[in-house]
Amino acid sequence: MSQLRLYDTARREIVPFEPGEVVTMYTCGITPYDATHLGHAAAYVGYDVLQRRLRDRGHETRCVRNVTDVDDSILGRAREIGVHYLDLAAAETAKFDDDMNALGMLPSWSEPRATSAIADIRGFIGMVLD
């Protein structure tokens, strides 16, 4: 079987990819304030293809894709249309999931929400400020 080679951004070159049995991947997810677009699909199709290739080679994959469910764009859009920001984020995330399912994309292993990490984020900011 031919060796998989990937671009290493730290080294700025294509290098042989020599994963263990389990391959972990992270991709920045959506900020769900409006409809999914082709740019979202293009990014996630690339990760989906890589994940499928790794699985075909016998690796277990764990792809984590976050959802930034609170930020200025969500707050502004929610105010603009008169809904609570969490309701907007939930509705747009559900539409995104439907779109990804329609494309036949593999589901993420985990999809942490930014709102679930606010206490940790505040703690990190406090450490930086101290």
Report residues per predicted region.
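N-terminal Rossmann-like or analogous alpha/beta NTP/dinucleotide-binding catalytic cores
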Residues: 1-130
